[in-house]
A protein has these predicted regions:
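Low-complexity, intrinsically disordered segments enriched in Ser/Thr together with acidic residues
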Residues: 108-135
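Short beta-strand segments of immunoglobulin-like
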Residues: 32-38
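Low-complexity, serine/threonine/proline/glycine-rich extracellular segments that form mucin-like
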Residues: 43-80
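Extracytoplasmic/periplasmic copper-protein system
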Residues: 144-179
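Sec/Tat signal peptide C-region and signal peptidase I cleavage site
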Residues: 22-28
Length: 179
């Protein structure tokens, strides 16, 4: 009985893990999770780098933040240096907790590693999304490698589907907050 139970648990574990294992290699580009999030909320974005550049190890990942994000804090990663570039706003805006800001995070870069081509890793940024439900926020990503660069920066035009893009930028769709 114990052997049957152990075999059943092993089979269930493999079946549950298989979709997760297949999800990362199937992605051919830098992606972001979640794909959808509530507007006007804090959220941890997780960017996944599933491979290097044509077999070459990843040495840097740069993420450009879209307009409307007034608060952003990158994840510290052992073995990687974090760089934050800011930009001035034309007009100061009220950020979370009533604070007025005239400068926001424009780009976050992690440099170091290297991350071998046959492994994946994730990089996080906690952001405060704007109160703009039904808006898609694009996060253009540039992946620098020992030999070469991959630019995941394409943003679809109004009448173009994202599935038509060769190197799509990671995207999060904002939805209305639940009551």
């Amino acid at each position: 009985m114990r052997d049957v139970l152990a075999a059943g648990l092993a089979t269930a574990t493999v079946l549950m893990a298989t979709p997760l294992l297949l999800a990362v290699p199937a992605a051919a580009h830098v992606t972001v999770q979640p794909k959808e999030a509530p507007a006007d909320s804090y959220f941890q974005l997780t960017f996944t780098v599933p491979h290097g550049c044509n077999g070459s190890a990843t040495t840097a990942l740069r993420i450009k933040l879209p307009d409307g994000i007034l608060s952003a804090k990158p994840q510290m990663k052992p073995g990687w240096n974090v760089e934050v570039k800011t930009r001035k706003l034309a007009t100061p805006q009220q950020a979370p907790h009533g604070k007025m800001v005239d400068e926001v995070v424009d780009e976050v870069a992690w440099r170091g590693g290297p991350l071998p081509d046959n492994l994946y890793d994730t990089f996080g940024i906690v952001v405060r999304f704007p109160d703009q439900p039904d808006r898609s926020l694009y996060f253009p990503a540039v992946q620098e490698c020992e030999k070469g660069t991959a630019r995941w920066i394409e943003i679809p035009s109004d009448n173009q589907g994202a599935d038509k893009l060769q190197t799509p930028a990671p995207v999060v769709r904002l939805k209305a907050k639940s009551p």
